[in-house]
Regions:
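Amphipathic alpha-helical "recognition" segments
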Residues: 149, 153, 169, 178-235
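Amphipathic, charge-rich alpha-helical segments that serve as recognition/docking helices
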Residues: 100-104, 108-171
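Long, charge-rich C-terminal accessory regions
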Residues: 226-233, 237-317
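Short, charged/polar connector segments at secondary-structure boundaries
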Residues: 2-114
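Amphipathic alpha-helical interaction segments
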Residues: 171-174, 187-190, 264, 268
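Short, charged amphipathic recognition helices of the HTH superfamily
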Residues: 159-177, 185, 237, 241
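Charged, alpha-helix-enriched surfaces in structured cytosolic catalytic cores
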Residues: 53-61, 93-94, 129, 143, ...
Length: 317
């Protein structure tokens, strides 16, 4: 029998009978239980639906700590089925960005190879990951109001994909609470107003950290002015509609939060309404203020009841 050449052997190994039937290393299944592992920065990606889009206010302090001490605890990572890269599971995108910076600056291996805790991708993976990041970000530096609002809008999207139906604000609040991120329904309503009516006009102001109370004031002002506009514009021909007017006025005040004055917004908006509606400024302002007061009375959260005083027990004679 003639001796096989290396080329003949390679041809036989590539024949049908010798085709690989097992899974490749790239497609082996992930662990089915929490498992410590070491991964490299090349294998990790930030969570793509992270609600935080602005720089963590504690970024410099966190970076200094990691440079000196490393990570305090292994970050939790996971992986979507069929994907090549791991992602941060709960929070941690800031720490991942810092590790990349430190690796680029120092080339120290401890910033490139990271001890992590792998946690399997759960059945409700997207919503579990998102609510986990929302909760973790609240604990580590907090989120701006608009970041929370956009995160909750994304959560609504995931819940509606999961259930196949639209959710009311109260049902959204119930589901968020059940998944470990409680948000009052009244806050969800304000967040919806911020995303729908305020964000297109004042993104710099909102991402700069405009808080809930200022957002409340703008939302109440918008609604009060809209009601007054609808009543006074009825049967009239007006050059613009209220939605356009509100956006045009508000855009002028897209500045940093420290320079923002809601009263200036109100003065400008009422002034332009008075001109377009051919109405007296002071009369219009009184109508709007009255409407604002009634709206606040209807939407304000009830005060917590004052606990009853303990009965006074007379001292023994």
């Amino acid at each position: 029998m003639a001796e096989l050449t290396p080329q003949d052997m390679a041809a036989k190994l590539l024949a049908t009978g010798f085709e690989r039937s097992g899974p490749s290393a790239a497609t082996l299944s992930d662990p089915i239980a929490d498992t410590p592992m070491v991964v490299t920065l090349d294998q990790l990606r930030p969570y793509d639906h992270d609600p935080r889009v602005t720089r963590n206010p504690a970024y410099a302090e966190i970076k200094a700590s990691i440079r000196e001490r490393g990570l305090d605890a292994p970050p939790a990572i996971t992986r979507r089925p069929g994907e090549a890269h791991y992602i941060i599971r709960n929070g941690g995108n800031t720490r991942l960005a810092i590790l990349r910076e430190l690796w680029s600056e120092t080339k120290e291996e401890r910033f490139f190879r990271i001890a992590c805790l792998f946690r399997p991708w759960p059945a409700r993976g997207e919503i579990v990951a998102l609510t986990g990041h929302l909760a973790e970000n609240e604990l580590r530096g907090g989120l701006t109001f608009i970041e929370r609002a956009l995160g909750i809008e994304k959560a609504r999207e995931f819940y509606e994909q999961e259930s196949g139906q639209a959710l009311s604000q109260s049902e959204l609040a119930r589901r968020l609470t059940a998944d470990g991120y409680p948000v009052p329904q009244s806050h969800i309503s304000r967040m919806n107003d911020a995303v729908r009516y305020l964000l297109p006009a004042i993104p710099t102001l909102l991402y700069g950290g405009l808080g809930r109370h200022q957002v409340d004031r703008l939302a109440v002002l918008r609604k009060a002015c809209e009601r007054t506009w609808e009543r006074r514009a009825l049967g009239r021909t007006v050059a613009v509609d209220f939605a356009t007017l509100f956006q045009d006025v508000l855009t002028q005040f897209d500045t940093q939060p420290d320079d923002f004055s809601p009263q200036r917004v109100q003065d400008e908006l009422v002034g332009q309404m008075a001109e377009l509606l051919e109405a007296d400024y002071d009369t219009l302002a009184l109508e709007i203020n009255d409407s604002e007061s009634r709206q606040r009375a209807l939407t304000s959260e009830p005060a917590a009841p004052t606990p009853a005083a303990a009965p006074v027990v007379p001292a023994a004679p």
